[in-house]
Amino acid sequence: MDLREGPLSSAKENIRFFHQGQKIETRLSDGMDELKPGEADRIVIAGMGGILMRDILERGRECVLHCGQMVLQPQSDPDLVRKKVHELGFRITDERSCFEDGKYYVAFSCEPGIEEHPYNEAEYLYGRILPAKKDPVYRKFLKTEEQKRAKLIETLTKSDKPSAKERLEGAQEEMNRILFCLGKYKEEE
């Protein structure tokens, strides 16, 4: 499903090329609007921001509740998507990361169920599974984020602007979340 005809045409070509026409059907659709509950046992949503993805999951709630697995790859705001996944009664079962064309990507797999332990804010933002797996690509991402926050904190510490103090507190909170996740790489070594 896609909202635009161009990407849908590309998908159709790939489906034909890989001889999957008997297994895959394409539809022009805004999110899951053209999908009926129970029609799909797996849902993949990728290549868009987390706000839009969260909204698609909410609008397609009935379809989501009838599926057995979702694979989600938000380009931004992964915390909003993870929170929505939990709100819908799914748990995150796996995470994968890659680095391509100068950008880090994370995808996560979800299945119906409740997390054994609730997520904290750091885990909503940065995930729980990749740091636990000590994923080397994701570690580089976290180190890059740590360096960005360190520079921002240094700049804000030197600033005399009234808004700098509030921004500094936010940057320090964000740094603590990053360090929490990086700490998982040091555990059990």
Predicted stretch roles:
Residues 1-41:
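S-adenosyl-L-methionine
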Residues 47-48:
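Glycine-rich, N-terminal phosphate-binding loop of Rossmann-like dinucleotide-binding domains
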